[in-house]
Every structure is written in C-alpha cells, then in structure tokens.
Amino acid sequence: MSVHIEAKQGEIAETILLPGDPLRAKYIAETFLEDVVLFNQVRGMLGFTGTYKGEKVSVMGTGMGIPSISIYVNELIQSYDVKNLIRVGTMGGIQADVKVRDVVIAQAASTDSQINRNTFAGVDFAPVADFSLLKKAYDAGIEKGLSLKVGNVFSADRFYNDQLDKQQLADYGVLGIEMEAAALYTLAQKYGRRALAILTVSDHIFTGEETSAEERQTTFNDMIVVALEAAIK
C-alpha cells in the first residue's frame, strides 16, 4: 500500500493507462479488459487490473492537473514498480487542422507550471515522451486507419486562465492544451520509466466546438484502443 493507493503488491500491472477521470478508468476496464479486479478506490480514484488480448494491464484515474497526477505517478513507480505509464485524456485543440475527436500523441509537453523550474533550479527542462511507446502507438493508430497528429502539447497549470496567450502557442506549433503530460513525462524520465500521453481533442479553443461531458467519460474509443495496443506490443 501507499498513501493514496490501497493495492497489494502484485495487483498492479507493469503497464498502466492513466485517464484523469476515474469514471473513464471504470469505463475502460468494463469495456476493454477481461478478468477485471478493482485494486483502488481511495478518495474515489478507481483503479482496475485486467487483461487485454491475454496481457496484464491496469487502468487508474489520476485526477486533474499536475499536482494530482504527480502524486499517483510517484506512488505507482516508487511503491508498485510500474514500468510503462500511458495517459489517456482530453485536450483542447488550438491548430486549424486539429479537429474535435482527433487523436493526438504528445511528443513533448511544454508547461507554465513552476514545478520543473523549482526542481531544476530555474532550468527549463524539456519533458518528452518515450520514443518506443510513441512509435508503437503511432503504428497501431496507422494500422487502424486513424489520422493521428503527433507533436508538442501544452500542460496548463490552470484550467481557467485568461492571461495565457493561446495564439502564441499555436503560432509556435503547439497542437493543444491539457493539464498533465509535462508532469508525467518529467517523473518518468526521473525514474527511468517509459511514458506517453495519447489525447482526444474534446473541444477546440478557437472555434468553440466541443463534446459533451458524457461523451468525454464514455467514448473516445480510438484513443483507448491505440493506448492498449501500444501497451501490449
């Protein structure tokens, strides 16, 4: 057990999918996994382990934002020796060719959070995805005929932030805005683990097009399948 996860040793797989929403974790477990076992419900952060195509895979919510995902990733790695961590979440698109419901693979994650500057004494550390996981996910998506976008995303420290210059981010090629990937990548690099963020565009920040809360919780299956295929290859 750890402070925020009640699983026993051996109950969490070496590879875990990490949606922000614990109800999406439940949906993934019930829809895609077999022989599912609940391993965590501390603070309502549901975690499950099952099998996908015969391979052991876990899925667990992380909550929203860098502080929350940092807690769970630290504990999953330090207390349960998880090797591969794949975020499956949503983002707001900011490029004209990034459409609502598109699947984006985050090659790198910029951020306005001070967490890395505090860690690295003012140095701008560049958090990046694990290339082997990225390639597996990309290949899986192409095999399924998906039009994937791969590139830089922005991990925002605040959801509501009128001062963030989103147009400047778009001008520099950032594909969209989410809230967790930079922390996930930084911690994976710190501990020598593999991490990837696969994201579905839930809304477009400039056009105003958006999906419903229910759709965000219970659909976006393309992203989930790409993540699971990357997890077992």
Swiss-Prot record:
The record marks 216 as: Important for catalytic activity. GO terms for biological process: purine nucleoside catabolic process. Belongs to the PNP/UDP phosphorylase family. The active site is at 203 (proton donor). Homohexamer; trimer of homodimers. InterPro entries: DeoD-type, Nucleoside_phosphorylase_CS, Nucleoside_phosphorylase_d, Nucleoside_phosphorylase_sf. Its EC number is 2.4.2.1. One of its GO terms (cellular component) is cytosol. It comes from Listeria monocytogenes serovar 1/2a (strain ATCC BAA-679 / EGD-e). Catalyzes the reversible phosphorolytic breakdown of the N-glycosidic bond in the beta-(deoxy)ribonucleoside molecules, with the formation of the corresponding free purine bases and pentose-1-phosphate. This is Purine nucleoside phosphorylase DeoD-type. Keywords: Glycosyltransferase, Transferase. It is an enzyme of class 2 (transferase). The gene is deoD. A purine D-ribonucleoside binds at residues 4, 178-180, 202-203. One of its GO terms (molecular function) is purine-nucleoside phosphorylase activity. PANTHER family: FI09636P-RELATED, URIDINE PHOSPHORYLASE. PROSITE patterns: PNP_UDP_1.
